[in-house]
Regions:
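Second-shell loop/turn segments in exported
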Residues: 49-60, 116-123, 141-148, 209-214
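Zinc-dependent metallopeptidase catalytic helix centered on the HExxH motif
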Residues: 105-190
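Surface-exposed patches in mature extracellular/periplasmic domains of secreted proteins
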Residues: 74-89, 143-150, 171-178, 236-243
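Active-site-proximal alpha-helical
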Residues: 186-267
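Zn2+-dependent metallopeptidase catalytic core
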Residues: 25-28, 38-44, 52-91, 96, ...
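Sec-dependent N-terminal signal peptides of Gram-positive bacterial secreted proteins and lipoproteins
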Residues: 4-22
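Intrinsically disordered, low-complexity Ser/Thr/Pro-rich tracts
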Residues: 17-27, 33-34, 335
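Beta/coil-rich, acidic/histidine-enriched accessory regions frequently appended to metallopeptidases
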Residues: 24-26, 246-365, 375-403
Length: 403
């Protein structure tokens, strides 16, 4: 009897050792689509209209709702509490050059946002953060197309986008990866000659955006919003007061709203504060690693612009811990959306651990030992095993070019 029991237990143990190899389930990722006709998407807070001929990620609305919630958290106010609050209407226009990043301009006005296909990917593009910040602002007062107010309007949008990106890095690193590093925002609003800023009163730069900066109006505006938040506890009180300031031109109304909200000395205190706190806006090492150690899976999307056409996980090194990377959407994007010949496409990897490559059914195709190149034929996704650092994960052999 004891012998039979021992044989049974041995067989059971062997079975348990074998089962996991066959029970491995394929990892599922959001599946994108290329629109063949105009479509509309709806979620709790968004109504999105997308032209035909646009690649749309499968988790687009989920991502935007996540940004919406994060933005309310960092700003301390709710979209829905604004006197002008409505569902956010987003229009995505198809354009042959629309994936050219900085060479086009997304816009927002009241509850309306115009974007382009590259912004839908949210892969290193924080445009949706900036434009959504505009809607949050405009929900609390009557919007204006008067560019004299660029410091206030663009400053609030850029600072709120920065704060949101920072929050995501700490609380939702997968979504943070999608919108790009917060330090990129600081890089874009660097001040080239800060001393010249102090030669004029702030109200002057509200009328004439400061020219010696990465982005006039945005640069000094972001810093002013940081000042309001850190010194007075918020950078939003002026928005509701703006509608009450009905006399004078736009900048005069903004000055009145600021003084009514924060006190008569609010403008005078900015320069002394900025001189003591300018280090807050140092963007730091632009090659610092991307930290994805708390992320289970991400999708690689190609980047197309006038400087480079690439399909890589990141332009920086990446820290990971058992990270799954979807490559199927990149192949769909290249082949069916951009019309590229991917028959000779290869996966090039350079990291500190092994990398397993799987087909769409979860079958292990091959394992790369730290560094190597394999054909993409049949590969749907990979797993970066263990804890390590990735120095490169690229799809090559389809006509890519690098800056």
């Amino acid at each position: 009897m004891k012998k039979k029991t021992a044989i049974f237990l041995t067989a059971l143990l062997l079975l348990c050792m074998v089962i996991p190899a066959f029970a491995e389930q394929a990892v599922t990722f959001p599946q994108g689509t290329i629109t063949s006709e105009p479509i509309e998407l709806f979620s709790e807070h968004f109504h999105v209209s997308i032209d035909a001929g646009v690649y749309v990620p499968g988790d687009l609305m989920e991502r935007w709702e996540g940004i919406y919630r994060a933005m309310e958290t960092v700003s301390g106010i709710r979209f829905e509490d604004g006197a002008y609050a409505r569902k956010i209407e987003v229009r995505c226009r198809a354009n042959e050059t629309s994936e050219e990043g900085e060479f086009y301009v997304p816009v927002a006005y009241q509850n309306q946002i115009d974007l382009y296909p590259a912004d839908l990917l949210a892969n290193g593009s924080y445009a949706i953060l900036h434009e959504m910040s505009h809607t949050l602002n405009y929900f609390y007062h009557e919007a204006s197309e008067d560019w004299e107010s660029r410091l206030m309007a663009e400053g609030f949008a850029e600072y709120t986008a920065y704060q949101t990106a920072k929050w995501l890095e700490e609380n939702d690193p997968a979504l943070a990866y999608a919108v790009g590093p917060s330090q990129q925002i600081l890089y874009n609003v660097a001040l080239e000659d800060e001393e010249t800023l102090y030669t004029e009163e702030l109200s002057h730069w509200m009328k004439e955006p400061y020219p010696y900066s990465g982005n006039p109006g945005y640069s000094e505006g972001l810093r002013f919003m940081a000042y309001l938040e850190r010194v007075y506890g918020n950078d939003t009180a002026w928005m509701t007061a703006l509608d009450q300031a009905t006399k004078g031109k736009r900048v005069e109304r903004e000055v009145s709203a600021l003084k009514a909200s924060y006190g008569e000395d609010v403008l005078d205190g900015f320069y002394p504060w900025l001189k003591e706190n300018s280090a807050l806006f140092d963007y730091g090492d632009m090659d610092a690693p991307v930290d994805l150690r708390g992320v289970q899976q991400v999708t690689l999307y190609p980047t197309f612009n006038r400087l480079e056409n690439v399909a890589r996980l990141s332009g920086r090194s990446v820290r990971y811990s058992d990270l799954y990377v979807d490559l199927s959407q990149a192949m769909l994007y290249l082949r069916d959306y951009k019309g590229k010949d991917v028959s000779a496409a290869q996966l090039k990897v350079d990291c500190l651990t092994t990398v397993d490559a799987f087909d769409a059914n979860g079958n292990l195709l091959t394992t790369i030992d730290k560094e190597g190149v394999i054909p993409m034929d049949g590969v749907a996704y990979v797993r970066l095993n263990g804890i390590g650092t990735l120095y490169g994960l690229d799809l090559i052999g389809w006509g890519e070019f690098y800056w």
